Every structure is written in structure tokens, then in C-alpha cells.
Amino acid sequence: MSTDADTFPADTVDAPVLRFAGVGMRYGRSPEVLKDISFALRPGSFHFLTGASGAGKSSLLKLIYMAEQASRGRVELFGRDINAIAPADRPFLRRRIGVVFQEFRLLEHLSAFDNCALPLRIAGGKPDHYRGDVAELLGWVGLKARMHARPATLSGGEKQRLAIARAVVGRPDILLADEPTGNVDQGHALRILRLFVELNRLGTTVLIATHDEDLVARSGQPVLHLEGGRLMQYGRSGSR
Amino acid sequence: MSDAAFDVQRWRPGPLLPRRDARDGALVFVVAVLCFLACLTALGSLAADRASRGWSSQLSDSATVVIQPRGAESPDAAAARAAEVLAGVKGVTEARALEKEKAEALLEPWLGREALLDDLPIPRLVAVELDPKGPASAESLDKALKAAGVQATVDDHSVWIADIKRAASMTRWFALGVCLLIITAAAAVIGFATRAGLAAHRDVIEVLHLSGAETGFVARLFQTRFATAAGLAGLFGAGTAAAIAALVRLAGGGQGLTPVLPLAWIDLLALLPAPLMAALTAAIAARLSAAAILREMG
């Protein structure tokens, strides 16, 4: 495994926002898709998660947003062992995580505006308090003219931007994005990256799983690289 | 509404569950049919209960006295005297000597018309109506007859009453059992249908769950949705059953269907809880199913 000055071994970061220690994961009885993963992310850091298809990027993200459980090892989020968190407390932890799903997971019967406002609504916010923020954010991702549109009428790129807007609208402490620029053109990809960087400047820890080598190179942000379910590198994008 | 017409200031949050779903129609239909069947069975069991109580009451409120005339006294005179004596016994509301023709009519099915010869000693009968609140015992009737010098046998139907009461009790329990079985089956099917409806919305649940929705938040959404649907279906099923019962009551009158299964208008009140029970069952099933699905999701 190669590292550089920006590497964050699991046991060398004080109060990490996220820490993996010897984590393995398998689906059912199948072979492990993640093996011996150990790393830690500082609060407010920005990382890319790279690797070929099937390398385990999505699985690693699922462990963080608690859609799956590690079969071994320990995952800590905001200083708490995920496996030890009571089910009743998990929703409150999830509200601190913004997720851009690879398959978007938009609610088809709701408008773009409603989809974007969903996390704020679930958190118990009052519409009068957040409607302005939602409108502004949708304008920022280029969906100002599509606020009332149902997801079925949106293009792939528009859906992706809507999914991103929904993930960041609640100003999460950590943002996870699974191929967030997979369906958008270069211009929109850079705009989305700028949004993530902006959010990161406000203190959100960002972890983006992507195939987009160009985006990674342009950003100059550190990379976690997975190969065959193993973490092979963490460091600057140019250091591989 | 076109996108251009979208007014942010007037926006109100949309429903988190799709408004209409073809599966909801199936749920409403199944619940309505089951509620209808459960209500009909409930009415049937009420009617069976009333019928069985009626049979027992009719038999225990009467007695038959068989007169055996002695000496020169004619059978008719002996029967008339016995009726007079019995009418004065405490716990007797009416005692009536049956004419010879009535006694013959009772015997005819057993002996045939030809056997009823004029010189055949046909026993005279006295029909005694007892006070339901404090009926006279067979012993007190017998004692009064003996005191008046009338030789007679008192039959208080006790042999028949025991059998009838046993049969009536069995009918009542059977009807109640069937009713409970149908209600349980209805509740189970409502539960399964609700679970199936909920599973169909798993994608919505997953998004809400991963966005930080608490179990109670998700459960309430489905609880309200399915309880409303099941309540309306229950109302429809119970309403149809009530309409049929009312028709039976009106068409039956005193001679038609109602003497066999006597329905009273007040019985229809028993159907009132049906929609509520359907809604409650669906709400509980929805809550448990939502909680189970969320538990599976972690």
C-alpha cells in the first residue's frame, strides 16, 4: 500500500469522523467483497474513492451509511461504533450523512422540489423555514425550471443533480456520493465538484466514489484506491 | 401544473406515499368481502342464539297433563275439572283442556286415521302455560290434581327440554365458533394484504429509512393509509351485510325466514364495530410490518 503526507492510517488520526479498523464484508455466504480495510478520515477532509467495477466502492459506502453491516472489524462514525448504536439512535445518525446513490433513489410520485426537501421534512423542519434554501439549491444545480417535474420526466443528468441536491440540502456532516458525475457532461461534473468543494469548505467531510479519473486529477484531492476489495492506497491523486 | 407556474412560496409538501395504487383497490376489495362474511356470520350467530333461547323458553314455559278419567266422570268433564284446578295453581298463567279432536289429531300421525275408532279410549289432554318468571313445578301440579281427586300424569317436558337445551347450546357455540373463525381469518387476511401492500412500497420505505426517518414516522404513514382503506372497506362490507339482513327481516316478517333464524333490528348494531376493527387490524398489521421491514434494513 502506498501512502504520502496526506495518508490517514486508522490509528493515527485523533477524533476521526470515520474510522475503519480491519473491516471485512460479505453478502450472505459469498466471498468477502471488502477485506481488511483500515483507514480514518479527518473531520472536514475530502477524499475520492476509486477502483474498478466490483472493487468494493459501493459496498464500502453502504457500510458507512448503515445499509449493510461489516462481517468483521470495526466501523466508527462520529466516534461511535456503528454496530453498537441502538436501532432507535440510527435515524439521527443517518441525518448527519448525505448520500448520493448510484441509482438515484428518487421518489417517483414526488416533484423535484419535494424530493429535494425530503431530508429536511424527515428531520422535522417547517416548510416555511426551508423552502427558500431548497429553491436556491435546485437553482444552483440547474433545476430551477424543473422544480415541479416528476423524476420520470427528468433526464439522467437532471436526476443525478436532483439526487445530489437532496444529499446536500441538510448540510450533512459527511457526504457520500456513489458515481455522482456518471450521467452528466463535463461542465456539470465540474459544477457538481465545485458544489462538493464548497460544502467541504463549510466543514462537511466528503467521500466520493468515482470512475472519473479526470475529475479526480482536476481536484487534486486525496484518493482511497480499492482493488479486489482491498485498500491499496490512500494519498494524493497524483501519487499512485 | 407547468414548471413555469411553480410557486415556491405556495408550495406545500406532497404526500410521501403515492396517492393511488392498483394494489390498494385489491386490498379494499378483499377486506370488504371478508368484513361482509364476518358480519353475516355474526348476524347468523345472533339469530341462532335467539332461536335456541326461544326453543328452550317455549318448552320450559308449558306442561302437558294427560287425564285418566275415573268412575262415572266422562273424560271431557275430567279434563275440564283438571283445567280449572290447574288454573288456580301458583305459577300457572293458563290451563286449557284440549278437545277430543285435537287429541286425535295429535295421535293420527302415529296411529293412522283408521285406528282412531270411536270406542278407542283417547286420553284427554290439558295444555298448561306456566309463568316464565316463576313457573309451577311438575310436583305442585301433580299435588293439586291429586288433592282435587283427578287422576292424571303431568309431563313438564323435562326430558325434551334437556335435549333441546343441549342442542340449542351446541348451536349457539357452533355459531359463535364459526363467527370467531371468520373474524380471525378476516384479521389474518387483512394483515397479509397490508403486509403485501407495504412490501410493494419497500422502495419508498428504503429511501425514507436511509434519509433518517424513524420507525414511528414510517409506520405512521402506512398505518394511516391502510387503516383508512380497511376502515372504508369494512364500512362497505358491513353496510352490505346490514342491507341484506334488513331485507331478510322485512321479507321474512313473522312467517318467512325470520322464525328459523330470528333477526331483530337491534342486531344490526352489532355490525357497527366491524369497520373499526378492520381499520384497527390494518393499522396494527401496517405498524408491525413497517417495523419488521425497517428492522431487516438495519
Predicted feature locations:
Chain A
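ABC ATPase NBD coupling module
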Residues: 28, 82-98, 199-201
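Helix-to-loop junction immediately C-terminal to a conserved catalytic motif
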Residues: 65
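Conserved ABC transporter NBD signature motif
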Residues: 73-81
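Short coil-to-helix segment of the ABC ATPase nucleotide-binding domain corresponding to the Q-loop/switch region
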Residues: 110-118
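Catalytic Walker B motif of ABC-type/P-loop ATPase nucleotide-binding domains
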Residues: 175-178
